[in-house]
Design a protein with these regions (language model features):
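Acidic, surface-exposed loops and disordered segments
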Residues: 1-204
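Peripheral terminal and inter-domain segments
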Residues: 199-297
Length: 297
């Protein structure tokens, strides 16, 4: 599509279909974000598809490939010189670890591809000293913006984030956390339709006894920590930014009342175990996104 159309369509996507990416699509995204265009001075300098101060290019690209046609699921590193993938390890026993380091965000964990970028600061610092850290911070934004635009151009979507458990993410990628460490990540997939509240909630229920809701009280942990409490005859969801009353839809599902401090949350539902105890809570935002929070004993 024309460049201005791609710019205008650029958006953050956090819902993806189960469709796989093709090798050609992955190859295109990798080339657009870290591809080598020219090497000169006997390999001392490299021009890539993204700018870098002094052509130092301090970033490395790691990939979790969940669903790419023709490539086994696993963790890989992109090798720009030669435009190749280096297999690092299988993910057969890593799913729970991924859930933990990515804070249970299903839209990231289950995406067909997850880009992880690490930085090797010394590549820039030896030449530019203190200003290097400003340069590095700006350059990762350029790389991720290229991923946004390249994704839009081929009918994919992405949403970058710097929220993850730092030391465990470094361990997962196999970097030392000092000379090389994770700075950003972004899931990529085919955008899915917005999740509507009618698809999120089940049938309503009248005259729910508030006492039956006491079992839902407690702490829930995910991207952030939430509290659920009963007070003044109502159930409340409590955040660091404020609290919001939950209107009963049925015994496990609730619609939020308007509160500008936490306006993004539209509805909440709880998942129970066989004994009726809450195991997790799912939150629907006004953007049609859902986030999971595990019950904390």
């Amino acid at each position: 599509p024309p460049f201005l159309e791609v710019i205008n369509k650029r958006a953050s996507h956090r819902r993806f279909t189960k469709a796989s990416l093709t090798i050609e699509e992955l190859s295109f995204l990798l080339w657009c974000t870290q591809g080598v265009k020219r090497v000169f001075k006997n390999g001392f300098m490299t021009f890539k598809t993204v700018p870098s101060a002094g052509a130092r290019h301090p970033f490395e690209t790691y990939l979790v490939l969940n669903r790419v046609k023709g490539i086994n699921r696993g963790l890989y590193r992109y090798v720009p010189h030669g435009h190749k993938l280096l297999f690092i390890k299988s993910l057969e026993s890593e799913f729970e670890n991924l859930e933990k380091i990515l804070l249970n965000r299903a839209h990231i964990i289950n995406a067909p591809v997850i880009f992880f970028w690490t930085v090797v600061p010394y590549r820039t610092v030896w030449k530019y000293k203190n200003p290097s850290y400003k340069m590095i911070s700006i350059e990762i934004g350029m790389i991720c913006q290229n991923l946004y635009l390249a994704s839009e151009a081929i009918g994919c979507g992405t949403c970058g984030t710097e929220i993850y458990i730092q030391d465990q993410t470094d361990d997962f990628l196999g970097v030392d956390g000092e000379d090389e460490f994770t700075v950003f990540l972004a899931p990529v997939g085919k955008p899915a339709a917005k999740l509507e509240i009618t698809n999120f909630l089940s049938n309503p229920q009248n005259n729910v006894d508030l006492n039956k809701l006491k079992k839902l009280e407690g702490k829930y942990s995910g991207v952030i920590e939430l509290d659920i409490k009963i007070k003044d005859g109502s159930l409340f969801l409590i955040l660091s930014s404020g609290e919001i009353a939950l209107k009963i839809h049925n015994e496990t599902e609730f619609i939020t009342e308007w509160n500008p401090a936490v306006w993004q949350i539209l509805a909440v539902k709880f998942l129970l175990d066989d004994e009726g105890r809450p195991t997790s809570m799912e939150v629907l935002t006004i953007n049609g996104l859902s986030f999971s929070f595990n019950s904390v004993e």
